[in-house]
Amino acid sequence: MTETYVRRLFDQYAGRYDAALTEHLHYRGPALLRDAVEAAMRAAKRPMHFRAMLDLGCGTGLAVAAFRAVADRLIGVDLSPAMIAQAESKGLYDRLMAGDLARFLAAESAAARQYDLAIAADVFVYVNDLAPIVSAVASVLTPDGILAFTVETHSGDGVKLLPTLRFAYGAEYLRAVIAAAGLTLRSLAAAAIRTENSIPVDGIVVVAMHQAGRGFA
């Protein structure tokens, strides 16, 4: 799926995005991510607090509202300038960037910037091969940093292009991608992320962390 296609899709969608997801698609991604991260922090006996948080594919800022109170500094990046404009109007972020995720992460890594939480809510479904992007995120996490994301799934293995032009991923594929990035999988839970034509969409909520944080239990 090309960068141009995704940018144009969401530039056109930006003005009605929040209403479409929350009112018509019953989107649950932000709440599911918040619950999964909170459970991981609770299991580790660590406070639900993050010095620097990165919202990948932040869109209009729907997901970050669930985390703003627990993040000192919040950075968002999205391919669509129109979505970024919507996010900026909410005043939730300390920094917003319009651009490609891979290029943004490469620049952050080169600048030695680090985040103790990175989230991607309903973002990776537009990426065929997750290995490069997950590895890039790992490169900007603190030694005990966390990556949490939602994706659609299917009953088979590997990656499948759906009729919606979104990708779905098998559980074993996700496990392999996490391991290849040098991250430790903390949870991989099935969940209905949203509905499509009133039918629940099968998804997975993933929480992973840096190998350096093996004490996380």
Question: Which residues does each PLM region occupy?
Answer:
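A conserved beta-strand element that flanks and buttresses the S-adenosyl-L-methionine
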Residues: I119
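Conserved alpha-helix/loop element of class I SAM-dependent methyltransferases that forms part
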Residues: H26-H49
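Conserved beta-strand signature within the Rossmann-like core of class I S-adenosyl-L-methionine
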Residues: D144-E152
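A short glycine-rich, Lys/Arg-flanked "PGG" loop and its adjoining helix->strand segment in the class I
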Residues: A131-P143
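Core SAM-dependent methyltransferase catalytic element
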Residues: T195-A217
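Class I SAM-dependent methyltransferase SAM/SAH-binding core
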Residues: A52-L54, G59-A106
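Conserved S-adenosyl-L-methionine
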Residues: T184-R194
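Acceptor-substrate binding/catalytic loop of class I
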Residues: D157-Y173
